Amino acid sequence: MPWLQVRLAISPEQAETYEDALLEVGAVSVTFMDAEDQPIFEPDLNTTPLWSHTHLLALFEADADPEQVFAHLRLLTGAELPEHQAEVIEDQDWERSWMDNFQPMRFGRRLWIVPSWHEAPEKDAVNLLLDPGLAFGTGTHPTTALCLEWLDGQQLDGTQVLDFGCGSGILAIAALLLGAREAVGTDIDVQAIEASRDNAQRNGVADEKLALYLPEHMPAMQADVLVANILAGPLVSLAPQLSGLVRPGGLLALSGILAEQGEEVAAAYAADFDLDPIVVRDGWVRISGRRR
């Protein structure tokens, strides 16, 4: 069925006011979207971050009158509206559309990420079947791709791999399929832990091969290989902790880092690692090295 979509161009300071007002006048959903394709944001603690220029999208039943919606918003907020528009959009099978656009992808020489509803293009390759669920990591983002290609290029046979910030579990599971003896995944999000567990089962990974923990429950360890695809801020602040999680002679790969943040992150690890040249792709970087 069709819907009336209302779009408002707002600042972060206006977000809560207009979200509440839209719900008050009958919106069935309200969504925040980046208005300027800003690649990333890193919030301060105890804040609810938004992009500096944000679009607020609200859906109403198709018979809602947009002019009445706008009039009520003016009354509720006591102010003139920011830039705004309304249009009728047709309903779609969004899940099917997304599934159609998520195709098998190759990383490095051996590794393929294959959506669980697709046939593997190369039966004899290392095929990781993925159902990303809430899209914690599918391989489509440059940072995930950089980490997957790095894993494909390593000799992982018999190693223990730590995936710090595991999300969908894609990196930990890839490491196991590429020969790692065991993997450990940790994430602050319980849903990420569940997504990782589901994807491991889908790929026939035995429970004893992949241990998943919230950070506060993770045991003391030193891994042969650590991969962390998170954000530059945490990578810098956690550098002593992450460095300590890699055994001497072990390997490290970091991403989730914008190109302009690369030198700062590399500097945080330079004292403990012999670092490789930074690899850049589409404005994102990968930092890797070997523990001294």
Curated annotation (Swiss-Prot):
Residues given in the record as S-adenosyl-L-methionine binding sites: T144, G165, D187, N229
Top-rank taxon: Bacteria
Subcellular location: Cytoplasm
Reactions catalysed according to its record: L-lysyl-[protein] + 3 S-adenosyl-L-methionine = N(6),N(6),N(6)-trimethyl-L-lysyl-[protein] + 3 S-adenosyl-L-homocysteine + 3 H(+)
A Pfam family reported for this protein in Swiss-Prot or TrEMBL: PrmA
Major site of localization recorded for this protein: cytoplasm
A GO cellular-component term linked to this record: cytosol
Keywords of this entry: Cytoplasm, Methyltransferase, S-adenosyl-L-methionine, Transferase
GO biological process: methylation
Molecular function terms from GO: protein-lysine N-methyltransferase activity
EC number, as in UniProt: 2.1.1.-
Family statement: Belongs to the methyltransferase superfamily. PrmA family.
Matches recorded under NCBIfam families: prmA (TIGR00406)
UniProt-listed HAMAP family: Methyltr_PrmA (MF_00735)
Protein task: Methylates ribosomal protein L11.
Protein name as it appears in the record: Ribosomal protein L11 methyltransferase
Native organism: Pseudomonas putida (strain GB-1)
Lineage of producing organism: Bacteria, Pseudomonadati, Pseudomonadota, Gammaproteobacteria, Pseudomonadales
Name of the coding gene: prmA
